[in-house]
Regions:
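Short beta-strand/loop segment at the start of cytosolic alpha/beta domains
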Residues: 1-14
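Amphipathic alpha-helical interaction surfaces in cytosolic regulatory modules
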Residues: 18-85
Length: 85
């Protein structure tokens, strides 16, 4: 399964809905979508089914820069915390 990306802008905020498996091969496209977004970024992870360590580190870095991780599953949240330790 591939990753589907749906993007919605609403004023100054942009929500990027991620659907499917997120792997390192998707980082370039994700970074491009984020660069083209407004200052308030929301990453909706509700339909993410699988991540790898590079994605976990990427999500942690996004959050550290002010992005909101919406609907982040507990296992991804825990993994982000472990990578930041």
């Amino acid at each position: 399964m591939t990753l589907n990306i749906e993007k919605r802008a609403d004023g100054d905020s942009t929500t990027i809905r991620l659907i499917g498996r997120m792997q390192a091969e998707h980082l370039e496209e994700l970074e491009k979508q984020i660069r083209e977004s407004g200052p308030a970024l929301i990453l909706d992870l509700n339909e993410v089914t699988l991540v790898d360590v590079e994605i976990v580190r990427f999500l942690g870095a996004c959050e550290a820069r002010g992005a909101t991780l919406l609907n982040c599953s507990p296992y991804i949240r825990d993994w982000i915390g472990k990578e930041q330790d």
